[in-house]
A protein has these predicted regions:
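Hydrophobic faces of well-ordered beta-strands that scaffold small-molecule active sites
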Residues: 56-62, 87-89, 122-126, 170-174, ...
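Active-site cleft segment of glycoside hydrolase catalytic domains centered on the general acid/base Glu
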Residues: 135-246, 250-269, 290-310, 429
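Carbohydrate-binding surface patches
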Residues: 382-430, 470-472, 478
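N-terminal substrate-binding region of glycoside hydrolase catalytic domains
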Residues: 22-160, 173, 179
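Aromatic/acidic polysaccharide-binding cleft in carbohydrate-active enzymes
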Residues: 286-369, 376-389
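Solvent-exposed beta-hairpin/edge-strand motifs
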Residues: 425-445
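Sec-dependent N-terminal signal peptides
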Residues: 4-13
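C-terminal beta-strand-rich structural cap/linker in extracellular carbohydrate-active enzymes
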Residues: 446-485
């Protein structure tokens, strides 16, 4: 377990919109950038464009288009700017097969090809039910169906999907949050038997049509009721483990570090069943305001705390070795509410208004944390003169010791832009020319030479500005940055 150390182009016509992109300025982002860490600024992290040829650990959500909760064409032009390698789509059985046996994939073709055109690999969550099969009397929204006419129709549909997108879609995820669906016995959280059967039958069809594509199971959020364990053991009993490449999880806790122990337990479970199966964070994100529905509702979020939360969650997953997908690219209009999880804020007409601070934060992550970066398990925090918990892990680049990521944790991210000046000592890392990278602003700061001391065991740094948002201390020659200030 990672140690939590206790130490101390329609929108352009709208009034007030400016900029070449036709987007409003983000007032919050301007305030964040106007109050950087109290250190000299040397430049900014160099961002990367999404590129099919470049490996990536990061994904962004492009979900709910199967239900028209967003308009793909209104935001696809911004997706490549994020630098992510992947994007999650939902397949929309009901939108594709409106008459039994008649498939219209034009809408999904547009999204798959659009992402590829932006340099992003699409991965596809196969879901949900289809009302044209409702004559069985089964709930065909997110409910999981047993063997029978619905399953037969579903498997035919899946075969058509996989056959059509072979060579384009990199991974199929079977269903979304099945632990939220009521099973035949009506007890929420006990749908694992029905789900396991659905997964195995679906995965067999996927593998028949595309032997090389990856397959992910579960996309579940329930860590406390044995859902993952019960499902994987049932999948194993049904002979489905050879089809399982990933187990995806969703996590929405106001204090993101609470996920660490659960993910480590899930990784251990997967390893005990088949070490080949890896854990992937498939959907997590933070609202930008107090929401009255959906995940992490009834909490006073802002665009400040949102950006910090998403950065912490991304860095936690990196430290755990989990590729990660951020929910979601834009605010989603459910009709009864307009969600605020988006990297881009949208209006009620699903038109983009401005890039939230979260957008720029994710650009900083994708620009730095490429597959050349890995966790350095030899680095640890040995002393700190503060009285709040710290999350700390070391990083390597191309196998060489590079630096450390650290932030103050233990509480929900705040709206404050204040940093605390802290003295720390790190063991297992001897930094010769380190710089300070603010993962939120992207500013690369100089560390005063007199404040950095290399010891036999590691490195000590005096008066280091720290806060409840990730900071990267890294060797200068291992970070790519511009001279922009």
């Amino acid at each position: 377990m990672k140690k939590i150390w206790l130490c101390i182009a329609v929108a352009v016509l709208t009034s007030g919109i400016s900029g070449a992109e036709g987007l409003r300025k983000s007032v919050t982002w301007e305030k964040i950038c106007a109050k950087p860490a109290p250190l000299p600024v040397s430049g900014k992290v160099r961002h990367v464009k999404s590129d099919l040829e470049r490996a990536s650990l990061w994904s962004v959500g492009s979900e709910t288009l199967d239900r028209d909760f967003a308009i793909f064409d209104n935001y696809i032009g911004y997706m490549g700017e994020t630098g992510v390698g992947y994007a999650r789509l939902q397949s929309g059985w009901a939108k594709t097969e409106k008459k039994k046996g008649k498939y219209d994939f034009e809408w999904l073709d547009h999204q798959v090809d659009g992402l590829i055109g932006e340099g992003i690999h699409p991965w596809l969550c196969l879901c949900y039910g289809n009302p044209v099969y409702a004559d069985t009397g089964h709930d065909l929204n997110a409910g999981i169906f047993p063997d029978g006419p619905i399953m037969d129709g579903w498997l035919k549909y899946v075969r058509q999907v996989v056959r059509r997108y072979k060579g384009k879609v990199t991974m199929y995820e079977v269903w979304n949050e099945p632990d939220g669906a009521k099973p035949a016995n009506g007890v929420k959280g006990e749908s694992w038997r029905e789900y396991s059967n659905l997964f195995v039958r679906t995965a067999k069809v996927i593998r028949e049509e595309d032997p090389d594509v990856k397959i992910a199971a579960l996309a579940a959020f329930s860590f406390s009721n044995g859902y993952f364990k019960n499902s994987l053991e049932e999948i194993q009993r049904l002979g489905g483990i050879p089809y399982t490449d990933y187990v995806t999880y969703h996590a929405y806790w106001s204090i993101p570090e609470r996920i660490v122990k659960r993910v480590e337990e899930l990784q251990a479970l997967c390893n005990s069943i088949d070490p080949r199966i890896k854990v992937l964070q498939g959907e997590s994100g933070c609202p930008a305001q107090l929401e009255y529905g959906h995940a992490m509702h009834s909490i006073e979020w802002t665009e400040y705390s949102q950006a910090k939360w998403d950065l912490r969650h991304m860095m936690i997953n990196f430290s755990l070795g989990c590729p990660s997908s951020v929910f979601t690219m834009v605010d989603l209009n459910y009709g009864w509410m307009l969600q605020s999880y988006g990297l881009i804020r949208m209006n009620l007409k699903s038109q983009p208004q401005y890039k939230r601070p979260k957008f720029y934060a994710i650009q900083n992550v994708t620009g730095i944390f490429t597959p050349e970066m890995s966790v350095d398990k030899d680095v640890r925090l040995s002393s700190c003169n503060c009285d709040v918990p710290m999350y700390v892990f070391g990083v390597k680049k191309n196998g060489n010791t590079a630096g450390t990521v650290l932030w103050q944790c233990g509480q929900k991210p705040s709206d404050s832009l204040e940093r605390n000046l802290v003295d720390i000592s790190l063991d297992g890392i001897r930094l010769s020319d380190p710089v300070y990278v603010d993962m939120l602003t992207g500013y690369v700061h100089e560390l005063p030479k007199d404040n950095v001391k290399v010891t036999d065991k590691g490195t000590s740094i005096r008066l280091l500005p720290l806060w409840d948002c990730p900071v990267l201390i890294i060797e200068r020659d291992m970070i790519d940055y511009t001279d922009e200030k």
